[in-house]
Curated annotation (Swiss-Prot):
Keywords: Cytoplasm, Magnesium, Metal-binding, Pantothenate biosynthesis, Transferase. Its main location: cytoplasm. This is 3-methyl-2-oxobutanoate hydroxymethyltransferase. Catalyzes the reversible reaction in which hydroxymethyl group from 5,10-methylenetetrahydrofolate is transferred onto alpha-ketoisovalerate to form ketopantoate. Binds 1 Mg(2+) ion per subunit. It comes from Mycobacterium leprae (strain TN). 3-methyl-2-oxobutanoate binds at D67, S68, D106, K136. The lineage of its organism: Bacteria, Bacillati, Actinomycetota, Actinomycetes, Mycobacteriales. It comes from the Bacteria.
Length: 286
């Protein structure tokens, strides 16, 4: 299949059948091309084969196996406790379900901070054992050496600046970053990760005006989460996007469904039909 003739931007609005769309395996070069052409794109998290397959069929070009699995899969309060051993099986499942999407794996807290050697060791595990197509790590200037080391080794890196959840304790909670005098440092972080070789950068909880400035300054795609409309792409945790998360969601989240309500209703109906001997019916039996 010729890559010149494929749709790499997701679902084609002119057709009702996603299956009919000519698609190719998304590479980092496609994301760069989309930025150059002014095409915005969406990224979602995924943590298992089944949801990865659904999102891939929906035309989502990039799936992130985020360390947010700490919260939505393992039930931790923050992303800090989750380990590489806990994330690797999730990456394997997502890779199997994503026939076209680029799969990015988050490097967990503590696995890359010691330096380039440690970063290369853990990133290699996610590429070899997990099958990830790229990795993501948090931080700006302070992790530029790690990013340069990984890219030199042939490992694509997605950076993450602004609010970095792994640093929630040192940042004093969930707070917008880059306001006032901190804006200069946020810009410096963005430039540093780009110069180190990152193929894209997530900007989380950054003021819209600053995110717009950075997006115009960088040649690599910017991915916003609470960073306004002018980023090249957007990302959300899928449970937040689909209404499965418990408790209050962040201001930057838009819920597109009520999956929790649908699952609850389905489970209740199933339990009631079993209790009342309605299920299984004759058509479900041999």
């Amino acid at each position: 299949m010729s890559e010149q003739n494929v749709n790499v931007y997701g679902a084609d609005p002119s057709t009702s059948s996603i299956q009919s769309i000519q698609r190719t395996k998304i590479r980092t070069k496609h994301l760069q091309k989309m930025k150059a052409e002014g095409h915005k794109w969406a990224m979602l998290t995924a943590y298992d084969y089944s949801t990865a397959r659904v999102f891939d069929e929906a035309g989502i070009p990039v799936l992130l196996v985020g360390d947010s699995a700490a919260n939505v899969v393992y039930g931790y309060d923050t992303t800090v406790p989750v380990s590489a051993d806990e994330l690797l099986p999730l990456v394997r499942g997502v890779v199997r379900g994503a026939g076209h999407a680029l799969v990015v794996a988050d490097l967990p807290f503590g696995s890359y901070e010691p330096g380039p050697t440690a970063a290369l060791a853990v990133a290699t595990r996610f590429m070899k054992e997990g099958g990830a197509h790229a990795v993501k790590l948090e931080g700006g200037q302070r992790v530029a050496e790690q990013i340069a080391c990984l890219t030199a080794a042939g490992i694509p890196v997605m950076a993450h600046i602004g609010f970095t959840p792994q640093s929630v304790n040192s940042l004093g909670g969930f707070r917008v970053q880059g306001r006032g005098g901190d804006a200069e440092q946020t810009v410096a972080d963005a430039v540093a990760v780009a110069e180190a070789g990152a193929f894209s950068v997530v900007m989380e909880m950054v003021p819209t005006e600053l995110a717009t400035q950075i997006t115009g300054k960088l040649t690599i795609p910017t991915i916003g989460i609470g960073a306004g409309l002018n980023c090249d792409a957007q990302v959300l945790v899928w449970q937040d996007m689909a209404g499965l998360s418990s408790g209050k969601v962040a201001r930057f989240v838009k819920q597109y469904a009520d999956i929790a309500g649908e699952l609850r209703r389905a489970a209740m109906q199933y339990a009631e039909e079993v209790a009342s001997a309605v299920f299984p019916a004759e058509e479900h039996c041999f």
